[in-house]
């Protein structure tokens, strides 16, 4: 990969420019970063991975402004029905189990190996999400289908606070 060549994935920036201007500094929104990007695996394939003991997975369910997380594996009846709103399934390391997702990860090989972990794939019903949280690492978010509102917090104090109600954090919206 020529790290000095501009990439549509990075809004026309080269990997060198991206790493200097944005990596660990500020977010970059790139609409249509991958032309005609579609889901690389079906919902059923994702659910099958979530049922495996060899794959890290978790569900996040929202009930009355409270978020509950459960770790997988998830058998056929251990996830809510897809018709139920307010829940999400997260499956870690999908690139190790699906060749198409592995190929997707190769587009990010400009990131040093020590900072490039894996591909997590999620499925969410309407109203589903992961709840207020912060990541202690940099994240590339690719949305293959559906609609989602993404927010990036301006919060500087990252101390966890027990009992804080959902929606009180000051966030700037990125859609």
Predicted regions and their residues:
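Active-site region of the double-stranded beta-helix
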Residues: 1-21, 35-172
């Amino acid at each position: 990969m020529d790290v000095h060549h501009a990439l549509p994935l990075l809004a026309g920036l080269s990997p060198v420019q991206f790493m200097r201007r944005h990596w660990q500094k500020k977010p970059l929104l790139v609409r249509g970063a991958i032309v005609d990007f579609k889901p690389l695996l079906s919902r059923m394939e994702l659910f099958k991975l979530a049922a495996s003991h060899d794959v890290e997975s978790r569900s996040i369910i929202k009930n009355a402004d409270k978020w509950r997380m459960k770790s997988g594996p998830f058998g056929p009846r251990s996830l809510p029905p897809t018709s139920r709103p307010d829940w999400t399934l997260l499956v870690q390391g999908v690139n190790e189990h699906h060749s198409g997702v592995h190929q997707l990860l190769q587009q990010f090989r400009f990131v040093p190996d020590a900072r490039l972990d894996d591909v997590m794939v999620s499925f969410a019903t309407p109203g589903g999400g992961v709840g207020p949280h912060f990541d202690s690492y940099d994240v590339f978010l690719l949305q293959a289908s559906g609609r989602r509102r993404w927010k990036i917090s301006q919060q500087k104090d990252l101390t966890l606070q027990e009992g804080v109600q959902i929606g009180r954090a000051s966030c700037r919206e990125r859609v």
